[in-house]
């Protein structure tokens, strides 16, 4: 009997792991450590389950799981002023966390931690860019009088995403042995 599954097909195991990643991220996001006044928050590692899923299954599947998470996050506490802003602040940036799986083939081949760090860095920068764009286009009125909207959005979004990234890195380093030795064997 021939296996008709392609590399892009979803198995039951992938779907279950994707649902678990979404659920864990959702729960972690509810334990907000700090909430910014105009949106954005610092959490105890809400991106980690999405990153781990992306490492296991690649950027495309990671993007989809992240986007679904973003939609749920938007539905349960999102702040929406325009449909484009909703996309820029919810499904797109969390979908872009899936870019942490860009180097999943290298990670699987080498079991090195470097692809994890490279992918996570690219993912957080991509997420940051979408939030900055949203800030410039839709939240520029919050900038102090006389301040450039782009500069305001860059600083505002960096103030919480840099901390989110640092927390993610600390957790990834704490999980380094598990990630490089056991993650692929599950």
Q: Where in this protein do the model-derived segments appear?
A:
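Interfacial aromatic-anchored transmembrane helix boundaries in multi-pass membrane proteins
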Residues: 28-42, 68-103, 139-141
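Residues that define the loop-to-transmembrane-helix transition and helix capping
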Residues: 60, 114-117, 151
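Structural signal for the C-terminal ends of transmembrane alpha-helices
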Residues: 55-57, 99-108, 174-181
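Juxtamembrane/transmembrane-helix interface segments of polytopic membrane transporters
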Residues: 25, 29, 131, 135-143, ...
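Alpha-helical transmembrane segments and their cytosolic interface
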Residues: 1-22, 150-186
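Short helix-perturbing small/polar motifs within transmembrane alpha-helices
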Residues: 2-8, 13-27, 65, 85-136
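Alpha-helical transmembrane segments of multipass membrane proteins
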Residues: 24-29, 73, 96, 126-131, ...
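Hydrophobic transmembrane alpha-helices
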Residues: 1-56, 60-61
